[in-house]
Amino acid sequence: MHLPREAFLLALAGAFIFPSSQQEKRTQRDLRVVCFYQKDFRNGTKAEQWGKKTPTQIWRGCMSVCNAIVVCLFELGVSETWNSKSCKCDCEGGESPTEFPSIRTGSSMVRGVDCMPECPYHRPLGFEAGSISPDQITCSNQDQYTAWFSSWLPSKARLNTQGFGCAWLSKFQDNTQWLQIDLIDAKVVSGILTQGRCDADEWITKYSLQYRTDEKLNWIYYKDQTGNNRVFYGNSDRSSSVQNLLRPPIVARYIRILPLGWHTRIALRLELLLCMNKCS
């Protein structure tokens, strides 16, 4: 089965540079480029948010920087399946390809070289440092966080926060609750660190993760190697931080943490990790 006609290539993550010479290609070898197919990018519409570049221009620019970290995300919709255990991009020779990769659902077949299975370096997104603003962090039933609960808003879900109101506390204790982060721009997310409430024995013991690149797209569950929704194991006390790395990393603007189990109450402090191509 061929790729749906509305599927086009976008490129994300940081400033996008189009080298104009072989020398520029060499000097831009540390540029991070993220390529992925997005089902909702419709029928030849220009990628307005990416500097008015067409999908083909973006593809060629991406592939011209061969030493970049390349991550691919295939979003084929709810009714279609992508059975490959990895995704691939043709960046072998440093030349722009003349066509998109050939992709067939259900066949695990993609032309090109393997994408990055794991990030070489990570850096905190900025929950603990405060660079993530309160309005970037939301939760289920947030309009009901009044009175005492107004001190335990989702914006309090910051790693190592101390004092009263030192975590996000869910007002309801069931599996329909979630905490959501808007990264403003799509980024390469490579891991998550979690803690419980600092002043009481309340924490999340396990959770799942959803993500998407646009609010108009369906949520995608992060899967394990068997194709099932991955269950991440969380905390066992109030203060220790537990790290879960994403292998492979994901391209996302929106991230949702969905608690599956908890001790006493759903309580969360966290930090997200971003994928870096070099230690900085």
UniProtKB/Swiss-Prot annotation:
GO terms for cellular component: extracellular region; plasma membrane. One of its GO terms (biological process) is visual perception. It is found in: Secreted; Cell membrane. Disulfide bonds join 119-275, 166-198. The keyword Secreted applies. It is a peripheral membrane protein. It comes from the Eukaryota. PANTHER family: F5/8 TYPE C DOMAIN-CONTAINING PROTEIN, F5_8 TYPE C DOMAIN-CONTAINING PROTEIN. Binds negatively charged membrane lipids, such as phosphatidylserine and phosphoinositides. May play a role in cell-cell adhesion processes in the retina, via homomeric interaction between octamers present on the surface of two neighboring cells. Required for normal structure and function of the retina. Homooctamer of 4 homodimers; disulfide-linked. The homooctamer has a flat, cogwheel structure with a diameter of about 14 nm. Two stacked octamers can assemble to form a hexadecamer. This is Retinoschisin. It comes from Takifugu rubripes.
